[in-house]
Amino acid sequence: MSGENVEVARGLFPPGRELDGPLIAGHPDMVRDLFEPLIAENFSVTFVAAGLTTTNRGPAAMSEATRDYMDAFSEHCSVFDRHIDGGDVVVALGRQHGRAHHGGEFDEETGLVFFFDPNGKLARIQGYQRWREALEAAGLSE
């Protein structure tokens, strides 16, 4: 099942593809339709931005979390280059860059941890601002 989990993570966050956060946040129905068949009943997403942590739950969690996260930025793009297989957990590592409403331009590490249930459904996505934090949360190392 772990290889399938990596493919799910890569399908949602393709390696090397620049993801325009505000554009994605502006299409909540598209995001919900993409995620809904892949998620467990208790699905949640947690992101941290500018010291604010938000957690959203349910079928609309990813679109709501993306919208909430993007509220901190006037411009934002992410690119994930690596997807690390940890069995029931997959870590996507990349960079995010753009301009925050408060604090100016940034270019920094970012990591997402995808937690899967025993049936291969996404149970949770947790965002981290440092690769090390994402790897530790997944019980992995580089």
Task: Give names to the regions the model predicted.
Residues M1-E142:
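C-terminal and inter-domain tail/linker signature
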